[in-house]
Each structure stands twice: as C-alpha cells, then as structure tokens.
Amino acid sequence: MKLLVTGGKGTIGKKVVAHFSKTHEIIIAGRTSGDVTVDIADSGSIEAMFESVGKIDAILCIAGEAKWAPFNSLTEDDYYIGLRSKLMGQVNLVRIGQDYLNTGGSFTLTTGILADYPVVMTTSAAMVNGGIHSFVKAAALELKNELRINVVSSGLVEDAVEKYEAYFPGHNPIPMKKVINGYVKSVEGKGTGEIIRMYDNC
C-alpha cells in the first residue's frame, strides 16, 4: 500500500514509519521536513499536499499541537492553537483527503490519554482530543467508497518519558511496540469508527 504519514519525523511518527516502511511505500509529510511539506493548520497547504501526492491507500496523522498551560492562564487564542492545529488540522485531512484515497482506504488520526485521563495544564489538549474521538465515530458513519477512519490514543510513551513524566505522576510508560500496533490495527485491520486506546487505566 501507499501510505501518507503526516508527522512522520516525530517521536511516535518515526517509529511508525520505520515499521510500515518494511512492507509499504511511505510518503512523509511535515511542516519543515519530509518528502512533502504541509501545515495541517492551513487547509490550503493540505490541498496542495494532496495535489502533489496524488492517490494513496492510507493517511496517518501523527501531528498537531495544543497549548499546555494552567487553566486560569489560558486565553481564547491559546485554545485556538489546538482547535486550528490538532483538531481542525486532522478534520481537514479527512475532509479534503477523502477525495484522494483509493476505494477501501483508511484514515488513522492521533490523540492521547488526556481525552480520558487529563492532568493539570492540559485543559485545551484534553478538549481537543475528546473532540477528535467524537469526530471519528461520527465521520465513520458517512464516509463513502468503503473508506475507514480510526484514531489511536496512546498514553505516556516510553520514548517521551524523560520529557513528560513530571506531568504524568504514577502513569505506566507505554512500550513503543504497543503504540505501533495501534496504527497497524487501524491501517491493516477492517475496523472503522474505533478509538484504539493504547493504555490500561493509566
């Protein structure tokens, strides 16, 4: 299959790319590097990316940002960072990308444990993650041409422990192999509308 991976250079993305590249053709899209550049917060950039890439079999989004800050310090503009990037960025990848997926193709979006188990300073990120979960379940009901859509939601991954463990006291780090398998389940399985949770109650 021909897979397009946005965020393929990140902590999770590079491991996902390494796995799928063994058996599939991979196109990496990133804001500053990759085979093609894209800013998922800009729908025009998304359209240009798809025009450049052409028809594909699967789209994986492992990109998007949201503001982490104390609730009482978050401004309206702070919330819009996550809404424009991680939420609408992924929504627009689906909205626009459906015309570039071959029949039976799939979308795999990415969220995280904050949708179910938020921690301090993550109000905006948790809100965005929850919105994506609802979007995936609803969009799965209406996608045409046998297209599928799922979202992988991971906990604190092993490769990011040093950077984020202070925010997640008592959380058990998730092995990267387990996280990768979430993407494999979405891309190579037959399910749709699924929230593939890669954590066990923290």
Residue ranges and their predicted role:
Residues 4-19:
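N-terminal Rossmann NAD(P)H-binding glycine-rich loop of SDR-like oxidoreductase domains
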Residues 30-44:
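Rossmann-fold cofactor-recognition segment
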Residues 40-56:
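Conserved Rossmann-fold cofactor-binding substructure of NAD(P)-dependent oxidoreductases
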Residues 45, 88-96:
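Conserved mid-core alpha-helix of short-chain dehydrogenase/reductase
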Residues 60-69:
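Conserved NAD(P)H cofactor-binding loop of Rossmann-fold oxidoreductase domains
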Residues 70-71, 78-80:
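Substrate-binding pocket helix/loop in short-chain dehydrogenase/reductase
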Residues 82-85, 91-92, 106-132, 136-144, ...:
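Catalytic loop of short-chain dehydrogenase/reductase
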Residues 147, 151, 157-162, 166-202:
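C-terminal helical subdomain
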